[in-house]
């Protein structure tokens, strides 16, 4: 064996090296290696180690990005992490039996908490840069979507999360698990030729034992151990690789590597535990470090103080005096008020003082959120509901307590009945209702959060009902009108199916609770009689009409609209009242449509739909196309006026009802005035839809709701009622529109009936010039209508002079009079009108070129342009053109008459001679 492999020592002399070179001249030359090259070990790592190392490095990167809130890089690192995990899935399935590593679950949990924390910080989110804000939304969506596959693992992790020390050691978990599994086989896997390797685990195990035994040593000794760690490793390497050949041989197994990793990880773990125990012994328990100076909670009263009403009131005034001041801890203020309430109840100071403290707690909760436009936190909202209901129950249970804002503070009475307290529960419940609306607007309407917040409406309505009972007992008319309006606004848009069942006789009317229509009628009539302000009365009328329309009380709703004259002065109302008016008109149109009043439905909806922005008029959202027309401040104000999602009216339903109503009115009118050049449009929007469809060279099958209505209109123009009905009433239209109606089957039957009748009218208008007489039974069979109904339709058309015909009852035929012009005659008349207009235009152009336009009597003397006739300046140009033509004709007639007179005189002279 060569001495190169036999001896790995560096202490050989130069002479010995020369001897070796001289004796082995023809053999391979020896090489000297630097210390760096000798320290590099060739290691064959398993696939699992590679994958896990990649995952842990990415997790470290994500943690670093989270510390500095670098959200774009966090997003890119998260994408890298998901890709790395996908690559590691085969290894996890094989080695871990498909169980996700705990360090990976910990990373996902930390990332989710980080995103939620940043997302809930509204002030911090506003200060984020555009790139960070955009990346935050993308990261939130991706993480929420990704962690759905790990919900069970995350739930188990959150039940028993790791401690901080475990989190730091978590990166070594994969290696620990490998080492534990490989530890049992480490002794068997080492051959006889590597005896030093077999002895190494024993030496490694002795080091932790010694470290545990020396737990009472000082921190200096611990630091000394950590400093000499590298020296120990180098000495172990020297002892291990006594033979240079062993150092450079490629290892045939991975168990040696696992042994090394196991030794190092255990050594680090033991030293870390020793250091942690030493710190625990010195410092005791862990304490949370609070930023800034720790403010001690002020003491309520002195230890030996006698707690009575004046002392509690003085303390209450002291706490509330800090209200609205700078650097006031509003959370601490609320806590102090709750503590003061508990003290007052413990010392039995009476219900009046408890009510006073309750009211101040409500005020403090309202003050916690300084920005009025933003909603309050959910914890404060729940607290507010609880305190408000508790206060109202105390007021109702004690009739001798009177709370009113007109009571002066010096006249408050807490000792003898009747008790007078300064405060306004009406203002508190109004603010509570406004906060509830803001909470609903802030939530995503398609999320579970919105449903959870909407459930709170039950408690809000209960609170309003408690306030209603209180003011019915001791309130004035103005206060009762205000609280009644709040109750109405929570009731008017809700549909009560029992009302329709009672109307049809399906439910007994007596012996049951009053229906919502009866409650609305009672509340609104009180406001009509007692209200002094126009706004409350106007809003009550609008809500009353809306509620009647919801329950198909068409005539009551219509009469209220006509008698109140709201349409005359609604433009002077505030924006929220105008929004309520638009909502009322939309719902009134739907009610008219359900009650077969097609023309009234069209009249109610035309003002909303002709503008092209019903979404904005109903306060159901802002159109992005009109964003440039409003400033940021205007947009913010308009968003505050938006209606909560559960109060929205379906816009597609609204548009479909409007277009169908327009079709049933417009198509027969077009057929009746086909050759009338001056016919007016009933519905401009529908007419535009129809014309745009006719301009298309190739029209496919209808897909959207508008296309279905346009296709139905084309079929109706030909009198084909079956095709028209199939386009309007089909599976797709039922799902989109008609199933949204209560009793949708009745609405569909009504639609088919109207389509048959209007198709019959259109057919008679279109083909009346073809027939000399038409059989009424054949028309009834063609349109599947009863014979009396067909007779009635034709009679109305004849009476209204829409159809020039007469009825022959014995033969049951309609005899056409042919008084209207034929198609050729109508086209000829149109042609004559157009030619006449063309002649007028040509004459005007000719007059301008010839100069006759400036004759005297039209635009003044041409030679005296500065002295033109002021009476004709800017007059009717068509009249001037006619005057010019008449003047020329008169001049010509006068000239001819003079010539005739001259000729007659000449003839007489000749005869006399």
UniProtKB/Swiss-Prot annotation:
<dbReference type="GO" id="GO:0016282">
    <property type="term" value="C:eukaryotic 43S preinitiation complex"/>
</dbReference>
<feature type="compositionally biased region" description="Basic and acidic residues">
    <location>
        <begin position="244"/>
        <end position="263"/>
    </location>
</feature>
<protein>
    <recommendedName>
        <fullName>Eukaryotic translation initiation factor 3 subunit C</fullName>
    </recommendedName>
</protein>
<feature type="modified residue" description="Phosphoserine">
    <location>
        <position position="34"/>
    </location>
</feature>
<feature type="compositionally biased region" description="Acidic residues">
    <location>
        <begin position="162"/>
        <end position="171"/>
    </location>
</feature>
<dbReference type="GO" id="GO:0033290">
    <property type="term" value="C:eukaryotic 48S preinitiation complex"/>
</dbReference>
<dbReference type="Pfam" id="PF01399">
    <property type="entry name" value="PCI"/>
</dbReference>
<keyword id="KW-0963">Cytoplasm</keyword>
<feature type="region of interest" description="Disordered">
    <location>
        <begin position="157"/>
        <end position="285"/>
    </location>
</feature>
<keyword id="KW-0396">Initiation factor</keyword>
<comment type="subunit">
    <text>Component of the eukaryotic translation initiation factor 3 (eIF-3) complex. The eIF-3 complex interacts with pix.</text>
</comment>
<dbReference type="GO" id="GO:0003743">
    <property type="term" value="F:translation initiation factor activity"/>
</dbReference>
<feature type="compositionally biased region" description="Acidic residues">
    <location>
        <begin position="214"/>
        <end position="239"/>
    </location>
</feature>
<dbReference type="GO" id="GO:0031369">
    <property type="term" value="F:translation initiation factor binding"/>
</dbReference>
<dbReference type="GO" id="GO:0005852">
    <property type="term" value="C:eukaryotic translation initiation factor 3 complex"/>
</dbReference>
<keyword id="KW-0597">Phosphoprotein</keyword>
<feature type="compositionally biased region" description="Acidic residues">
    <location>
        <begin position="11"/>
        <end position="20"/>
    </location>
</feature>
<feature type="modified residue" description="Phosphoserine">
    <location>
        <position position="177"/>
    </location>
</feature>
<dbReference type="GO" id="GO:0003723">
    <property type="term" value="F:RNA binding"/>
</dbReference>
<keyword id="KW-0648">Protein biosynthesis</keyword>
<comment type="similarity">
    <text>Belongs to the eIF-3 subunit C family.</text>
</comment>
<feature type="compositionally biased region" description="Basic residues">
    <location>
        <begin position="264"/>
        <end position="276"/>
    </location>
</feature>
<feature type="domain" description="PCI">
    <location>
        <begin position="645"/>
        <end position="821"/>
    </location>
</feature>
<dbReference type="Pfam" id="PF05470">
    <property type="entry name" value="eIF-3c_N"/>
</dbReference>
<comment type="function">
    <text>Component of the eukaryotic translation initiation factor 3 (eIF-3) complex, which is involved in protein synthesis of a specialized repertoire of mRNAs and, together with other initiation factors, stimulates binding of mRNA and methionyl-tRNAi to the 40S ribosome. The eIF-3 complex specifically targets and initiates translation of a subset of mRNAs involved in cell proliferation.</text>
</comment>
<dbReference type="InterPro" id="IPR027516">
    <property type="entry name" value="EIF3C"/>
</dbReference>
<feature type="modified residue" description="Phosphoserine">
    <location>
        <position position="165"/>
    </location>
</feature>
<dbReference type="InterPro" id="IPR000717">
    <property type="entry name" value="PCI_dom"/>
</dbReference>
<feature type="compositionally biased region" description="Basic and acidic residues">
    <location>
        <begin position="172"/>
        <end position="184"/>
    </location>
</feature>
<dbReference type="InterPro" id="IPR008905">
    <property type="entry name" value="EIF3C_N_dom"/>
</dbReference>
<feature type="region of interest" description="Disordered">
    <location>
        <begin position="856"/>
        <end position="913"/>
    </location>
</feature>
<feature type="compositionally biased region" description="Basic residues">
    <location>
        <begin position="887"/>
        <end position="898"/>
    </location>
</feature>
<dbReference type="GO" id="GO:0001732">
    <property type="term" value="P:formation of cytoplasmic translation initiation complex"/>
</dbReference>
<feature type="modified residue" description="Phosphoserine">
    <location>
        <position position="186"/>
    </location>
</feature>
<dbReference type="InterPro" id="IPR036390">
    <property type="entry name" value="WH_DNA-bd_sf"/>
</dbReference>
<feature type="region of interest" description="Disordered">
    <location>
        <begin position="1"/>
        <end position="22"/>
    </location>
</feature>
């Amino acid at each position: 064996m060569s001495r190169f492999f036999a001896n790995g020592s560096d202490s050989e002399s130069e002479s010995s090296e020369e001897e070796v070179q001289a004796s082995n001249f023809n053999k391979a030359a020896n090489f000297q290696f630097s210390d760096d090259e000798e320290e590099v070990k060739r290691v064959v790592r398993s696939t699992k180690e590679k994958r896990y190392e990649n995952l842990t490095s990415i997790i470290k990167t994500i943690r670093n990005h989270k510390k500095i809130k670098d959200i774009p890089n966090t997003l890119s690192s998260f994408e890298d992490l998901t890709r790395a995990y996908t690559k590691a899935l085969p290894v996890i399935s094989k080695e871990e039996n498909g169980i996700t590593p705990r360090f990976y679950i910990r990373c996902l949990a930390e990332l989710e908490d980080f995103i939620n924390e940043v997302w809930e910080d509204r002030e911090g989110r506003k200060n984020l840069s555009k790139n960070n804000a955009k990346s935050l939304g993308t990261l939130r969506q991706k993480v929420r979507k990704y962690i759905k596959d790990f919900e069970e693992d995350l739930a188990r992790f959150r039940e028993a999360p790791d401690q901080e020390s475990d989190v730091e050691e978590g990166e070594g978990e994969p290696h620990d698990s490998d080492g534990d599994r490989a530890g049992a086989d480490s002794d068997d896997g080492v051959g006889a030729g590597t005896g030093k390797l077999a002895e190494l685990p024993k030496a490694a195990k002795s080091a932790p034992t010694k470290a545990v035994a020396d737990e009472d040593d000082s921190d200096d000794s611990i630091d000394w151990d950590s400093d000499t760690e590298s020296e120990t490793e180098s000495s172990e390497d020297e002892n291990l690789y006594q033979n240079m050949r062993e150092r450079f041989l490629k290892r045939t197994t991975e168990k040696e590597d696992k042994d090394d990793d196991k030794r190092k990880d255990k050594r680090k773990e033991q030293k870390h535990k020793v250091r942690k125990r030493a710190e625990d012994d010195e410092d005791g328990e862990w304490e949370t470090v609070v930023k800034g100076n720790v403010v001690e909670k002020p003491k309520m009263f002195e230890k030996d103080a006698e707690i009575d009403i004046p002392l509690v009131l003085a303390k209450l005034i002291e706490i509330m005096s800090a209200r609205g001041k700078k650097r006031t801890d509003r959370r601490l203020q609320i806590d102090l008020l709750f503590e003061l309430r508990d003290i007052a109840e413990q010392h039995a100071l009476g219900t009046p003082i408890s009510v006073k403290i309750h009211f101040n707690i409500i005020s403090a909760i309202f003050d916690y959120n300084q920005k009025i436009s933003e909603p309050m936190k959910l914890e404060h909202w729940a607290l507010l509901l609880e305190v408000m209901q508790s206060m109202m129950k105390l007021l109702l249970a004690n009739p001798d307590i009177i709370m009113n804002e007109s009571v002066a503070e010096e006249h408050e009475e807490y000792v003898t009945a009747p008790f007078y307290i300064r405060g306004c529960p009406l203002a508190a419940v109004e603010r509570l209702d406004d906060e509830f609306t803001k909470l609903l607007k802030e939530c995503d309407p398609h999320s579970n959060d919105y449903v959870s917040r909407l459930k709170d409406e039950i408690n809000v309505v209960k609170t309003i009902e408690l306030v209603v009972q209180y003011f019915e007992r001791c309130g004035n008319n103005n206060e009762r009108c205000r609280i009644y309006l709040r109750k109405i606004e929570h009731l008017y848009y809700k549909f009560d199916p029992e009302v329709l069942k009672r109307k049809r006789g399906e439910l007994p009317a007596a012996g049951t609770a009053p229906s919502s229509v009866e409650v609305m009628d009672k509340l609104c009539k009180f406001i009509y009689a007692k209200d002094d302000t126009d706004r409350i009365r106007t809003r009550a009328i609008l809500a009353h009409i809306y509620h009647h329309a919801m329950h198909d009380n068409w005539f009551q709703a219509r009469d209220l609209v006509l008698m109140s004259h709201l349409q005359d002065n609604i433009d002077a109302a505030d924006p929220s009242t105008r929004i309520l008016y638009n909502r009322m008109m939309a719902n009134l149109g739907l009610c008219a449509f359900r009650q077969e009043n097609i023309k009234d439905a069209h009249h109610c909806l035309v003002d909303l739909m002709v503008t092209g922005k019903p979404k904005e008029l109903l306060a159901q959202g802002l159109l992005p196309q009109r964003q440039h027309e409003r400033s940021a401040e205007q947009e913010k104000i308009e968003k505050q006026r938006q209606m909560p999602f559960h109060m929205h009216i379906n816009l597609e339903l609204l548009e479909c009802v409007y277009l169908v109503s327009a079709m049933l009115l417009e198509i027969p009118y077009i057929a009746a005035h086909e050759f009338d050049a001056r016919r007016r449009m009933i519905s401009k929007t529908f007419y535009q839809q129809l014309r745009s469809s006719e301009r298309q060279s190739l029209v496919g099958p209808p897909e959207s709701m508008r296309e279905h209505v346009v296709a139905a209109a084309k079929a109706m123009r030909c009198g084909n009622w079956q095709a028209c009905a199939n386009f309007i009433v089909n599976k797709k239209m039922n799902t989109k529109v008609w199933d949204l109606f209560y009793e949708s089957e009745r609405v569909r039957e009504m639609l088919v009936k109207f389509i048959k009748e209007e198709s019959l009218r259109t057919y008679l208008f279109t083909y009346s010039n073809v027939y000399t007489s038409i059989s009424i039974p054949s028309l009834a069979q063609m349109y599947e209508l009863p014979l009396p109904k067909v007779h009635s339709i034709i009679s109305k058309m004849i009476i209204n002079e829409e159809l020039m015909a007469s009825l022959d009852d014995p033969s049951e035929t309609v005899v056409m009079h042919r008084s209207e012009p034929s198609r050729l005659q109508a086209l000829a008349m149109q042609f004559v009108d157009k030619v006449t207009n063309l002649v007028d235009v040509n004459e005007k152009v000719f007059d301008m070129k010839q100069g006759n336009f400036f004759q005297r009597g039209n635009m003044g003397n041409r030679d005296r342009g500065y002295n033109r006739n002021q009476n004709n300046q800017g007059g009717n140009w068509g009249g001037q053109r006619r005057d010019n033509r008449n003047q020329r004709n008169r001049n010509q007639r006068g000239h001819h008459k003079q010539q005739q007179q001259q000729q007659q005189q000449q003839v007489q002279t000749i005869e006399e001679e």
